[in-house]
Amino acid sequence: MNRPVISLGITLLAFVHALAAPVKVLLIGQPPDHGYRSHTYLPDCELIAKWLKQNGDFETAVARGWPTEPHAFEGVAAVVLHDKLGGDVFFAPAHAAQAQALIDRGIGLVALHWGTGSAEPAAGEPWLRALGGHFNAQKGGFSRYKVEASTVRLADPSHPISRGWQDFPMRDEWYYDLRFLPAAKPVALAKVGGKDYPVGWAYERPSGGRSFGFVGLHFHDNLASEPFRRLIVNGVLWATRTEVPAAGATVKMEPKDLDLPEEFEKLRPAAKSPANRPAGDPLIVRRMTECAAYQERLDHALEHGTAIPQALAEIQAFLLTAPGVDPKSVETTGVGVHYKTTEGFGYYLRIPFDRLPESK
């Protein structure tokens, strides 16, 4: 006689439990395959997972390559690919059917930097349909890339991914001449080689599910920029159908968060490290003293109101003619300047963490 009431109660409890369930995000990275502090897939994924948890009840997992555990994809709301040629990873023959089933289920899909690419002809079309756009890395493909300082600009201020950030300077390895589906919507633009290109996009798949692609994140240190990381985390939130806060995602971090694990840190060029010379070596002392003076010069400019892009441009111009500096080695990252001495010692001048731009 009371069975309908009991049944209704069980249904309501199940509904409430479903509402309270954490949002599951699987981030797929891989071991290092590039030079020092670039393509730092796994450390980047760990940081993104950390920032997601600052924005609600998220359950995250970072996988080293395509997961083989039977329940790895169970209940996953979104998959983030930050690896070598994400399309080839996602639609690899060994699990292409599994990947397509995830897409058909309507999961969110996010690809970052090289993860946006595909080189295998068999994966290219399925990847394009899944992501809405991709870096065509096939032999003879038309997509290009260039390392260049640019400004990341809002393409659609009304889109949720655009919340909480404004145009910001960034040096990255930009992919351009990408292939897009007509329904893909640019959310971020950058000028590469003097021409505007979409570098971030959102795509609502006709069969259900959201996809977000962003070609930046070649350099690990770019994550020191708050608007840069907010753009990325906004995109992941949107892909999971989580409401993006009006002020954008929370993306708090500390300087130590940019430290790399040993697997990636060991890529530091040991042969060109001052540590290979005896302690107290007069040359090392002089070069380190010079580096400290250059850092002080950069700090002084910022303390006196010089904007970050101008301060970086000024210190870069100064280093190009500084004694003992290899001018071909001087590079800005948007959050600092790398340079090497004529002996091959590498140094980095960094924008103080508390002076990096915030986009509220």
Please report, for each region that a protein language model flagged, where it lies by residue.
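Positively charged n-region of N-terminal signal peptides that target proteins for export
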Residues: 1-4
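Bacterial N-terminal signal peptides
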Residues: 7-17
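Extracellular ligand-binding/catalytic regions of CAZymes and related secreted enzymes
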Residues: 21-23, 29, 47, 54, ...
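Helical hinge/lid and interdomain linker segments adjacent to catalytic or ligand-binding clefts
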Residues: 24-28, 33-118
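A glycine-rich, often tryptophan-bearing local segment used as a flexible ligand/cofactor-contacting loop or short
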Residues: 28, 86-163
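Short, solvent-exposed loop/turn elements at domain surfaces
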Residues: 33-38, 89, 195-198, 222-225
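Catalytic beta-strand/loop cores that center a nucleophilic Ser/Cys/Thr
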Residues: 133, 141-208
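Charged, low-complexity interaction regions
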Residues: 301-309
